[in-house]
Amino acid sequence: MKLEMICTGEEVLAGQIVDTNAAWFASTMMEHGVEIQRRVTVGDRLEDLIAVFQERSLHADIILVNGGLGPTSDDMSALAMAKAKGEPLVENVEWRERLEEWFTRNNREMPLSNLKQAMLPASAVMVDNPVGTACGFRVKLNRAWLFFTPGVPFELKHMVTEQFVPFIRDEFNLDSKVALKKLLTIGQGESALADKLEPLELPEGITIGYRSSMPHIEIKIFARGEKAIAVLPRVAGHIKMVLGTAVVAEDKATLAEEIHYKLLNSGLTLSVAESCTGGMITSQLVDFSGSSSYLQHGLVTYSNESKVRVLGVNPSTLDDHGAVSIATVEEMAKGARQILDSDYALATSGIAGPDGGTDEKPVGTVAIALATRGGVYSQMIKLPRRSRDLVRSLSAAVAYDMLRRELLAEAVIVDYQSIGRFSK
């Protein structure tokens, strides 16, 4: 089966928005053992849409078309598909009734423009959209099925998961015996990870892939077939052993997610004091429902004055050692923990750049501390200075990993291949 994707919209083509839908779809299909062969982005011009539908339908077996199903004049996917096939648009009565029902239920008058969303190519098969007003549909053109979905990410994800994946499994008799194990890593580059894993002799049906999403690199271990699935846990365990401290989570998208589920319902509490990370640690945890059960407070103490007045950092500590120092960050963590008597507190202070570095403390220098009821762990690390965002996100990841290792009763301070450390 040859799978392709067509993304529509001038704002996507012009780079005004990042096409996260395409990235999500490709990743999701890989998890089902299906690789996208080609992705095309086209603007909101009728003749361009018609041409790309006609041309790609000669080569693909299934094409997911994303976007252009709204009620406005620049939403032209349905019209373009009808013209590409040489047939009229006709009203789908079922979807019109669904639209009227939706607006009535929400106590709103339906604009006439929304009726456009019930107009589908004559040969189209309606595809339900349970969470929006844009009607999905599929049409056979040349050798391909074209499967139309709205550009709203939430709606796309529902339709792909609930309708697209089951359709292609039935239509193309895909083998459902596919399993995937994900290992999340920090502190090593993709090439360094590959150098360690490429020499491994993998069982038949097992393959390894890499996905860089800084500050993490995700290792995907695919198993295709019953025999490969049976040995997947053993293979994953061996890969973890080979990579050592680089592996920080299994089957989680981020370290924040790993920390969230370790603290959720644990009865333990966490406070955070952030300088260079600017609320990133706290924000990433708040993304998850239920974080209020363990997260007591997150403070952004960016100035020296706030470190002193809010966290109780001794002014002489700042004078003697500076804001970016082991001494200061330890006092920040202790102060954050003591405010509400939390079980744990994380603190960060660093130089994210691009300015502010010195010979002694260059850009990328970050001090991180973890305060516990039994004491304080701290380190000052040297991070790659490629960008301000990378310094901040890597700082948050190392802080999370310190807490993760403490929760597992492991050594809190460990070496990462691509992250240096200052001696205390």
From Swiss-Prot:
InterPro entries given in the database record: CinA (IPR050101), CinA-like_C (IPR036653), CinA_C (IPR008136), Competence-induced_CinA (IPR008135), MoaB/Mog-like_dom_sf (IPR036425), MoaB/Mog_dom (IPR001453)
Pfam families according to UniProt: CinA, MoCF_biosynth
SMART domains, alphabetized: MoCF_biosynth
SUPFAM superfamilies tied to this protein: CinA-like, Molybdenum cofactor biosynthesis proteins
Domain of life: Bacteria
Gene3D superfamilies: 3.30.70.2860, CinA-like (3.90.950.20), MoaB/Mog-like domain (3.40.980.10)
Family from the record: Belongs to the CinA family.
PANTHER family hit by this protein: NICOTINAMIDE-NUCLEOTIDE AMIDOHYDROLASE PNCC, NMN AMIDOHYDROLASE-LIKE PROTEIN YFAY
HAMAP family with a match to the protein in the record: CinA_B (MF_00226_B)
Full protein name: CinA-like protein
Organism per entry: Shewanella baltica (strain OS195)
Lineage of producing organism: Bacteria, Pseudomonadati, Pseudomonadota, Gammaproteobacteria, Alteromonadales
